[in-house]
Amino acid sequence: PVVAVPNWFSLAAISVGLSILILALLFRDSAGLSSGGRGFLAFVAYAIATFVVWLLYDFTLEYMTPVMLAVGVALCVAALGVILVLLAEAHEWAEALWLKQSRRPTLPRTLPDHLLPKVSVHVPAYNEPPEMLMQTLDALAGLDYPDYEVLVIDNNTRDPAVWQPVQAHCERLGARFRFFHVAPLSGFKAGALNYVLRETDPAAEVVAVIDSDYLVEPNWLRDLVPFFDDPKMAVVQAPQDYRDGDENLFKAMCQAEYRGFFRIGMVTRNERNAIIQHGIMTMVRRRVLDEVDGWPEWCITEDAELGLSIFERGYTATYIPHSYGQ
């Protein structure tokens, strides 16, 4: 049955007022949104405001005991957290779908070969299948770039049958590839990266890092290194991608979750020079990497911590939402 709400006008007015406050918060950083994006945010704001007002109104009609009141307040605090997350997600969706023009450059740039700096590509590995790692190195050997080196470091792998085939493969690939097996070596992945940083050619101006199971596209360096033409640019980041997402439903769902981060969250962060650096498909200016004393070995998320240290020193970073490998 339809039940009359005697103070419906006041509730509606409160809903409108709350919606305006939410919209003011959402529109503070939405200058680049099209009308579709603003309309989407308005719908979200009014829906959330209506839900909140009705929930609180219905709650006040209940007979309250001290326990019920305490539980109700706790649930309201939890609901506030959920609402804040929903608002942040809505803003990210709006920017991903309805942004009229990006504030940051995201298209590949070109420079003539004589202006491209030398790049040192670092590949850390621990107890990795040699056949897989050799495929990674073969892909690096096919890079379309005039001046680069590849440093492979295997740290703490005990079985020589695992790392020696990779060492031999590096020798076959030529002088551009250098292999290091170090045991014992502390510092985990960061320790391995710092080791090869000390072995890097002094002429290298950019350090790039990939994982041992990643097959890069030939144009990776040629497309992204030119962004370092900006002297304030310290980090150039490409997304992670995966080549087994179509094998089954579970892997497809995992890949969809990753894509939400790399195609939405990282894009909106890039608009504000606030990307999260990750230690694969990343490039760092060598001078800046030395300035922050290399990769932080004390931190399990050495990649994100490195990015924060670089931002703290006033440098910029950019994210290119194009897959350059899997």
Label each residue range with its predicted role.
Residues S120-E128, L143, F227:
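A conserved hydrophobic helix/loop-capping motif in glycosyltransferases and polysaccharide synthases
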Residues N156, I210-L215, W298, I310:
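The conserved acidic donor/metal-binding loop of glycosyltransferases
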Residues P239, G314, T318-G325:
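Catalytic beta-strand/loop signature of glycosyltransferases that borders the donor
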Residues P1-D113:
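N-terminal membrane-anchoring/stem segments of glycan-assembly enzymes
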Residues A168-E205, P218-I300, E305, S309-E312:
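Long helical/loop segments within the catalytic core of UDP-sugar-dependent glycosyltransferases
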Residues L137-D147:
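Short, acidic, metal-binding catalytic loop of nucleotide-sugar glycosyltransferases
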Residues P146, D154-V166, A183-S186:
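A conserved acidic beta->alpha catalytic loop
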Residues P117-S120, E149, E305:
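Cell-envelope/extracellular polymer assembly enzymes that use nucleotide-activated donors
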